[in-house]
Amino acid sequence: MLKEAHIEFSQKRRFYTNELKGKSKILVALHGYGQLAQFFSRKFAALDQAYGLIMPEGPHRFYLEGSSGRVGASWMTKEWREQDIEENTRYLLALIEKVKAENAAASIYLLGFSQGGATAARLYQSSPDLFETLILWASVFPPDVTVQDFDQAGTLHFAIGNQDPYFLEAQKEDVLQTYRNLGFKIHEFEGKHDIDPTTLSKILQ
């Protein structure tokens, strides 16, 4: 009879960054499902001079179509989900604590896009004092994170496009009300399921 077993070992995780030294603000941005950090980072190119940028990559990489071609990554699936959540949080905390130790005066802004939003919310929940601001973008708020977890939260923002195909109008209103109840400032922009540079700039002002 076979039974599930586990083993622990050290491993590397990949992230992308620009020059952090001398930057007073650092943006950590978590990509969505099926994206790679390298290409997701292009959406933030306009911030390269003013902000330190850190783009972690989800641990699960896969072919987007069939068994070859373009590759994407995700933060988790439904399989062994709780363990992935725990390991993602440990990985991201280790990364951010290292960055903070090397850039003690910098303020850290955390953004999660789409699937990365749930990972960002859990990370913020675990150590809210590390972050100046939490920005969740086109993401459903994770049900395992409660209102009480954000009682002492800093600045909270939620952004969504008015033509986002993943949020039908009725569902979108429910999502927006959830974020309002949590104390998030709502930003709706003209667009679909994507990062809008103008809206992002307004949030970061």
Question: Which positions does each model-derived feature cover?
Answer:
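Short beta-strand/loop motif that positions the catalytic acidic residue
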Residues: 157-164
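Hydrolases whose catalytic domains are alpha/beta-hydrolase-1, hotdog thioesterase
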Residues: 119-123, 145
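Gly/Ala-rich beta-loop-alpha elbow adjacent to hydrolase catalytic centers
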Residues: 111-116, 120
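A conserved short beta-strand
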Residues: 129-141
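Catalytic nucleophile serine of serine hydrolases
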Residues: 32, 114, 138
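Active-site signature of alpha/beta-hydrolase-fold catalytic machinery across serine-
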Residues: 42, 122-126
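C-terminal catalytic histidine-bearing segment of alpha/beta-hydrolase fold enzymes
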Residues: 169-176, 180-205
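Serine-hydrolase catalytic machinery in alpha/beta-hydrolase-like enzymes
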Residues: 5-20, 24-103
